Amino acid sequence: LLASSLRRKRLRTFFTVASIVIAFLLFGLAESMRYALQSGVDVAGADRLITMHKVSFTQLVPQSYESRIRAIDGVVDVTPQTWFGAWYQDERNQIPTFPVKPEAFLRIYSDYLVPEDQRLAWVADRSGIMIGRGLADITGWKVGEAVPLRSSIWRRTDGTDLWDVTVRAIYDLPQGGDTRQILMHQEYFEEARGMAKGLIGWYVVKVSDVERADVVARQIDLQFANSPAETK
């Protein structure tokens, strides 16, 4: 009887199931962002701002915003970040993973301790990743090791959720910061993903003067006021 009812009301069933899936996805994104804000990757800091969609961090913003943000007086550097939803072997165990621009990321997060040869190797390999010491200890991954990551959110242009990457660098953080994360190349992510091309999750912005951080933040938001993707 239940199956018969579901068949008769396929559209309603589809939207019901879809709403449940979306609800769980949004919950996962919320938990992920909470983790990012509280973890060793301290997204916002004394000289760092986070710029995201005004409505919600689950709404994406255009990559084209980066050049306009860079042009604002007081901005030193910018990198995009997006929640990747990575998992390895067991989907229940999500690994905080963010596509970034490697060189800009390391300039903004200058406290990341990375051997120079590994830093250069990561920057040079578009499918390379940098992982934290804590994650390396948990997984046993070594520099040079190929890792088949999967994403619970992002499928590739070929329709699969498998992202083959190679560990190129392992970073440490001073004072016991959280090092259980993965940083991957924004260019690789943008080229290979099958949806939402040209959009990113949020920007991390480094400012030249901490005392003017609020002023810079307002200038950034004014740049995109009354646009389809206003920021905050």
Where are these regions (language model features)?
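Short phosphate-engaging motifs
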Residues: 13, 33, 212-213
